[in-house]
Design a protein with these regions (language model features):
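NAD(P)H dinucleotide-binding glycine-rich loop of Rossmann-like/cofactor-binding domains
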Residues: 93-151
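Conserved Rossmann-like nucleotide-cofactor binding loop
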Residues: 40
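Extracellular beta-rich ligand/substrate-recognition surface
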Residues: 7-14
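Short structural boundary motif marking the start of a folded domain
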Residues: 1-6
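Glycine-rich beta-strand-centered segment in the early N-terminal region that forms part
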Residues: 22-37, 47-98, 103, 111, ...
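Short Gly/Pro-enriched turn/cap motifs at secondary-structure boundaries
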Residues: 21-22, 54-60, 130-135, 141-142
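Residues that act as N-cap/strand-start positions at coil-to-secondary-structure junctions
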Residues: 14-17, 137
Length: 151
């Protein structure tokens, strides 16, 4: 599927509107259409080089929209559901999640890694694979995100 997104192709500089391809969702993932995205100071810190990340990466971790497709194993979300994003793709199994501290989930290690929870990427453009900030990349028309980030 084709989409447009605001991409940081280098470690500093402007976000650039680019044409990308989105893969279908994998297990425990959903394909979403973002209707709204928030601009956060984190995005500005990325742009000016204050926060390290693995470019290229689609910006944005605050957004809302509509679920378009669900991957294998997703049972609590259906196509057509409206959602807002949660910045933490909590696992529900680590010691933090089991004590109600999902904001400290072990999955936090993936937030700026540029990969999905399985270590792969769902966005492609200019012959490269792209990551998404906080596994969300809300500065895109469509993206695949972890089902645990859909509220």
């Amino acid at each position: 599927m084709k989409t447009k997104a605001a991409v940081m192709w280098k470690e500093t500089g402007p976000f650039e509107i680019s044409d990308l391809t989105v893969d279908p969702p994998g297990p425990e993932e959903v394909l979403v259409r973002f209707d709204y995205a928030g601009l956060c100071h984190t995005d500005e810190h990325m742009r000016n080089g204050d926060i390290g990340f693995n470019p290229p990466m689609v910006g944005g971790h605050e957004g809302s929209g509509v679920v378009e497709e669900v991957g294998p194993g997703v049972t609590h979300i259906q196509p057509g559901d409206h959602f807002v994003t949660s910045w933490m793709p909590y696992c529900g199994r680590c010691r933090f999640c089991l004590t109600g501290q999902t904001n400290l989930c072990d999955n936090g290690q993936y937030l700026m890694s540029g990969t999905m929870l399985d270590g792969t990427q769902r966005l492609h453009g200019r012959g490269q694979k792209l990551g998404s900030v906080d596994l969300l990349g809300t500065f895109s028309q469509r993206n695949v995100i972890p089902a645990s980030c859909v509220v």
